[in-house]
Amino acid sequence: MAKRIDHTGIMVRDINASITFYEEVLGMKLKDRITHTNGVIELAFLGFEDGPETEIELIQGYSSELPAEGKVHHIALLTDDIAAEYTKAEKMNAKFIDEEITTLPNGYRYFYIEGPDGEWIEFFQR
């Protein structure tokens, strides 16, 4: 069962400039930075302290087509059993964006479904 909102993914053009902004202007700390398994997408997770708060995920390389106001890519719900969430979504006939659960190099696992208005919802396991 999903436990809380884990992070919000924001698509960015320049991940280094965005990290600097979130650190220097907003006072956030870089918690993790990885290259996706596809070798193209760069991800950075930022938060305020070492507590279990909702984080910001910066995403570079997903799409070069960003509107001037930026783009929220998805919301992520934290789970401690990603396989059970996947099975539940299948049983509920959810529209899947991912055909399988993806495991990132740092061990994080995720998959996406669409909400009723096309919004992307990620189930995420740390």
Swiss-Prot record:
<dbReference type="GO" id="GO:0004462">
    <property type="term" value="F:lactoylglutathione lyase activity"/>
</dbReference>
<feature type="binding site">
    <location>
        <position position="122"/>
    </location>
    <ligand>
        <name>a divalent metal cation</name>
    </ligand>
</feature>
<dbReference type="InterPro" id="IPR004360">
    <property type="entry name" value="Glyas_Fos-R_dOase_dom"/>
</dbReference>
<feature type="binding site">
    <location>
        <position position="42"/>
    </location>
    <ligand>
        <name>a divalent metal cation</name>
    </ligand>
</feature>
<comment type="similarity">
    <text>Belongs to the glyoxalase I family.</text>
</comment>
<dbReference type="Pfam" id="PF00903">
    <property type="entry name" value="Glyoxalase"/>
</dbReference>
<dbReference type="GO" id="GO:0046872">
    <property type="term" value="F:metal ion binding"/>
</dbReference>
<keyword id="KW-0456">Lyase</keyword>
<feature type="binding site">
    <location>
        <position position="74"/>
    </location>
    <ligand>
        <name>a divalent metal cation</name>
    </ligand>
</feature>
<feature type="domain" description="VOC">
    <location>
        <begin position="4"/>
        <end position="126"/>
    </location>
</feature>
<dbReference type="InterPro" id="IPR051785">
    <property type="entry name" value="MMCE/EMCE_epimerase"/>
</dbReference>
<feature type="binding site">
    <location>
        <position position="7"/>
    </location>
    <ligand>
        <name>a divalent metal cation</name>
    </ligand>
</feature>
<dbReference type="GO" id="GO:0046491">
    <property type="term" value="P:L-methylmalonyl-CoA metabolic process"/>
</dbReference>
<dbReference type="GO" id="GO:0004493">
    <property type="term" value="F:methylmalonyl-CoA epimerase activity"/>
</dbReference>
<dbReference type="InterPro" id="IPR029068">
    <property type="entry name" value="Glyas_Bleomycin-R_OHBP_Dase"/>
</dbReference>
<dbReference type="InterPro" id="IPR037523">
    <property type="entry name" value="VOC"/>
</dbReference>
<protein>
    <recommendedName>
        <fullName>Uncharacterized protein YwbC</fullName>
    </recommendedName>
</protein>
<keyword id="KW-0479">Metal-binding</keyword>
<dbReference type="InterPro" id="IPR018146">
    <property type="entry name" value="Glyoxalase_1_CS"/>
</dbReference>
